[in-house]
From Swiss-Prot:
Family: Belongs to the cytochrome b family.
Annotated binding of heme b b562, by residue: 83, 182
Keyword Membrane tagged: yes
Main location: mitochondrion
CC annotations in GO: mitochondrial inner membrane; respiratory chain complex III
Transmembrane parts of this sequence: 33-53, 77-98, 113-133, 178-198, 226-246, 288-308, 320-340, 347-367
Native species: Trinomys setosus (Hairy Atlantic spiny rat)
Gene: MT-CYB
GO biological process: mitochondrial electron transport, ubiquinol to cytochrome c
UniProt: heme b b566 binding residues: 97, 196
Protein name: Cytochrome b
Length: 379
């Protein structure tokens, strides 16, 4: 009698995806982030579901319903802060996951990479809508500023913005629809994750050397399940430390004041994980130009396979490219810092320099450095 794990139509799929999956024997901890993102999204859906049981998507009661969750619901404060800080963890892992993909040339798997970029856009949109729901000052003004960017689209812009708002300003209709979209989007994300994994398992995982590893594969279970569990425990340690010791560390104090359309906060800024893109948006004085730069700052990831000029896939044996990648990371940290600063000198010029260098590193320096490395190796 054959093993049920290998014969049952449903269990067989799980077996081929997580148990008997042939995996390169040398993948490092950088390959842990995929599974951590899966766990993160599951946690977000569970905590979000419990929050939705008590939350009311109405401008008059939204803010007080969040207060009610924190004060009166059993462990409501824990659910709320686990959800808010879980989003931060999600983005940290997302950026690590993308960074690993760039470093080791994982973007060569075109379908997996492109579905991943669609996932990134979907997660960013979902997180943005979630930030609006508590209906604090930064929620309201963040929603107003970011949705207003669409008015820069020629001809249809202003109509489009009013259509999204459901009126002439961010109001009850906007909050209700944002809650509906914020609720449905994680399930759409989960469907995209399945497609992402489907494409990945067509080719198999990449590995740190960037070489074909077909001759050296090991089963996913128990080797990588135990490794993933270690990553999971470390993630839970970080998340619980953040949630229990400093839950408001990554939040904005302005969001503890209820939304007031008549009072603009001195510095409107999004959550920390969007600050790099926000800095790029602000560094261009033209509205449409800023919006295009903002979109292109993420969309540029789709060009990476076309910009890959090296004859090696991974950066493991390419020290010059490694230096450039770490320069890019430093640049993104600077952009994140600038995004949280007021629009005044010297921050304006630092932001403009960092924005220009961001695009220069990816579009010009990285491809030319790769060509130079090819020459150094006489290839």
């Amino acid at each position: 009698m054959t093993n049920m794990r290998k014969s049952h139509p449903l269990i067989k799929i799980i077996n081929h995806s997580f148990i008997d999956l042939p995996t390169p024997s040398n993948i490092s901890a950088w390959w842990n982030f995929g599974s951590l993102l899966g766990v993160c999204s599951a946690l977000q859906i569970i905590t979000g579901l419990f929050l939705a049981m008590h939350y009311t998507a109405d401008t008059t009661t939204a803010f007080s319903s969040v207060t009610h969750i924190c004060r009166d619901v059993n462990y409501g404060w824990l659910i709320r802060y686990a959800h808010a800080n879980g989003a931060s963890m999600f983005f940290i892992f997302l950026y690590f996951h993308i960074g690993r993909g760039i470093y080791y040339g994982s973007y060569s798997f075109m379908e997996t990479w492109n579905v991943g970029i669609i996932l990134l856009f979907a997660v960013m949109a979902t997180a943005f809508m979630g930030y609006v729901l508590p209906w604090g000052q930064m929620s309201f003004w963040g929603a107003t500023v970011i949705t207003n960017l669409l008015s820069a689209i020629p001809y249809i812009g202003p109509t489009l913005v009013e259509w999204i708002w459901g009126g002439f300003s961010v109001d009850k209709a906007t909050l209700t629809r944002f809650f509906a979209f914020h609720f449905i989007x994680p399930f759409i994300i989960m469907a995209l994750v399945v497609i992402h994994l489907l494409f990945l398992h067509e080719t198999g995982s990449n590995n740190p050397s960037g070489l074909n590893s077909n001759s050296d594969k090991i089963p996913f279970h128990p080797y990588y399940t135990i490794k993933d569990i270690l990553g999971l425990l470390l993630m839970l340690l970080a998340l619980l430390s953040l949630t229990l010791f400093s839950p408001d560390l990554l939040g904005d104090p302005d969001n503890y004041x209820x939304a007031n359309p008549l009072n603009t906060p001195p510095h409107i800024k999004p959550e920390w994980y969007f600050l790099f893109a926000y800095a790029i948006l602000r560094s261009i004085p033209n509205k449409l130009g800023g919006v295009l730069a903002l979109v292109f700052s993420i969309f540029i990831l789709t060009l990476l396979p076309a910009l890959h000029t090296s004859k090696q896939r991974s950066m493991t044996f390419r020290p010059l490219s490694q230096c450039l990648l770490w320069l890019l990371v430093a640049n993104l940290i600077i952009l994140t810092w600038i995004g949280g600063q007021p629009v005044e000198p010297p921050f304006i010029s630092i932001g403009q320099l960092a924005s220009v260098s961001y695009f220069c590193i990816i579009l010009i320096l990285m491809p030319t450095t790769s060509l130079m490395e090819n020459k150094l190796l006489k290839w």
